[in-house]
Structure formats: structure tokens, C-alpha cells
Amino acid sequence: VAARKAFLDGGSEAQINAAYLAAAGHTDSDVPYNNIVALNENGATLHYQYKSFARPDESRSLLIDAGAEVDGYSADITRTWARDDELFGELIEAVDREQQALAHKVRAGLDYRQLHLEAHLRLGSVLKALGIVDMEPDAMLQHGVTSTFFPHGLGHPIGLQVHDVAGYSDVDGQ
């Protein structure tokens, strides 16, 4: 909430990061990983690490991937916000809906690989519905199109290790 407010108030990446840290009760040195705070085009750079002190002329979007820690338990909080861009706002809302629907399917014993593939198919459906990609979702998956928009794994063990590796392993960890 604090990061979103700083973004909407026109803050710089550094100011948005400072607002997040203050709200989380942390400093840069005690978060579980370096926060990613990216305005506008910077959000397209995977693991963007620069937090500019300069306020952009126009803040159109914010991507924040920030950590927090309580009693040795690490959390990874990732959010994206858009301002004054109807299509991007619709994309964010649609991806949020699909993420929540997929999260509700998680059960003990469910194969992670199936969820990972379903996430790509759901993303493909969103991209097609919004007219961003003119292909069927299964064709997008087959040709690696969804990987352009989703270049990482579905998730990772929060609290144990806060970085995931793209792809997936079999039940024996291979």
C-alpha cells in the first residue's frame, strides 16, 4: 500500500523503495534479497536492480518485487500497478484473476508441473482475449510465446529460498 501510494504520488524508484521499507519496518540491509522497484520501461528488465533518485516525467507503471522478514521467515511480495493505460490495467486485472484461480487449485499431492503448464495456458488465454497475441493458448505454449511474458517458474518455496529456477523438476527433484 505504501509503495503504491508513493508511485501514485509521483515518487522516484528510490522514494518508492524507501516508502516500502518504512512500512515493512526494514532497511535495505535486512531484507531477504535486494528489492526490485522499477518504473515504466525498467519493469521489462528481469531482476532490475537500479533505484533511480530522479522522478520520471511520467510514471506509467510500477513493478515491485520486494522482500520482508519476520522471525527468520522470508516473504516475497510482487505487485504491478498501472496508471492511465486501459489495456495494461486490464492485463494486470486479468492476470491477477487467473493467478487467484490457479492458487485456489493448489492441493497437497498436486503435480507442480501441471500447475506450471496450466499457468502458461491461462496466460495464453488472457493474451488472446485482450488481443495482444493472435494465437491459440496451446500454440503459444508450444512455440514459447507465453515464456516471453512469463520467463520464470510458477513459484518457489517462500520462507526457505526466495529464488526460483525456470522450468520444473520431476518428483525426484531432477
Language model features: what each stretch is:
Residues 1-174:
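Active-site neighborhoods and metal-handling regions in enzymes and metal-associated proteins
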